UniProtKB/Swiss-Prot annotation:
It catalyses: a (3R)-hydroxyacyl-[ACP] + UDP-N-acetyl-alpha-D-glucosamine = a UDP-3-O-[(3R)-3-hydroxyacyl]-N-acetyl-alpha-D-glucosamine + holo-[ACP]. Pfam families: Acetyltransf_11, Hexapep. The lineage of its organism: Bacteria, Pseudomonadati, Pseudomonadota, Gammaproteobacteria, Aeromonadales. This is Acyl-[acyl-carrier-protein]--UDP-N-acetylglucosamine O-acyltransferase. One of its GO terms (cellular component) is cytoplasm.
Length: 263
């Protein structure tokens, strides 16, 4: 179904079962396949491929030569019905690749809202990405990666499969992540190590001086006290009672399985 207000270039190929919302624009030579839903106000440039089952929200911008909802590159994939969901107001620049999930996980790759994906970013199968993130050119997310909110990935940075990055973390360009990165932490290097707290990012997002100070104390407990994660958890849990910002640390570390980056 195509909304009458949609603007579709005559050379675009739209499957009869695709759902195209109000005021959607689709450029030349773009192909929208079966079981694709594109929400109101989304703009799709030329030469884009969108395969289903894929649901794209409202007011997104998808630039030329991107591949959205393609089969994953997991060798175990055998054609099962899996999904991709993209939220609202994302910007997906040229040559980005977003793959659907696998039945070995939740059969779903999910992207939140208001994210910026610069040129040639790869989002592999079963990734879960929050809101308000920035991924610079050629950032690469392997399968099953979980990214929180307000994360910044530098150009050419890459993360190992099943890796996690907590909200408000900053990943430097060309960093290689083989362990989890806790919330608020800046990471750089190959393999990446921690370089303090993303204080400037927190200030820009309206965190109070007291909250930032508490996050810094939590970072020191985690990385400079000489304690194991099990030993430091009671300290962080006590801190979180007085400062909610520290609770992100606690919740993230409770789910730790792969270990966290270390100096």
């Amino acid at each position: 179904m195509i909304d009458p207000s949609a603007k579709i270039h005559p050379s675009a190929i739209i499957h009869p079962n695709a759902v195209i919302g109000a005021n959607v624009e689709i450029g030349a030579f773009t192909c929208v396949e079966d079981e694709v839903e594109i929400g109101e106000g989304t703009w799709v440039g030329s030469h884009v491929l969108i395969k289903g089952p894929t649901k794209i929200g409202r007011n997104n911008k998808i630039f030329q030569f991107s591949s959205i909802g393609e089969d994953c590159q997991d060798k175990k994939y055998a054609g099962e019905r899996t999904f991709l969901e993209i939220g609202d107001a994302n910007v997906i620049r040229e040559h980005c690749t977003f793959h659907r999930g696998t039945v070995q996980d939740q059969s779903l790759t999910k992207v939140g809202s208001r994210n910026l994906f610069m040129v040639n970013v790869h989002v592999a199968h079963d990734c879960m990405i929050g809101d308000d993130c920035i991924f610079a050119n050629n950032a690469t997310l392997a399968g099953h990666v979980h990214i929180g909110d307000w994360v910044i990935f530098g150009g050419l940075a890459a993360i190992h499969q099943f890796g996690r990055v907590g909200s408000h973390a900053f990943i430097a360009g060309m960093a290689a992540l083989n362990k989890d990165v806790p919330p608020y932490v800046m990471a750089a290097g190959h393999y990446a190590t921690p370089f303090g707290i993303n204080s400037e990012g927190l200030r820009r997002r309206g965190f109070s001086a007291e909250a930032i100070s508490a996050v810094k104390r939590a970072y020191k407990e985690l990385y400079r006290s000489g304690k194991t994660i099990d030993e430091v958890m009671p300290v962080l849990e006590t801190m979180a009672q007085d400062e909610p910002a520290v609770a992100l640390f606690v919740e993230f570390l409770k789910k730790n399985e792969r270990g966290i980056i270390r100096p």
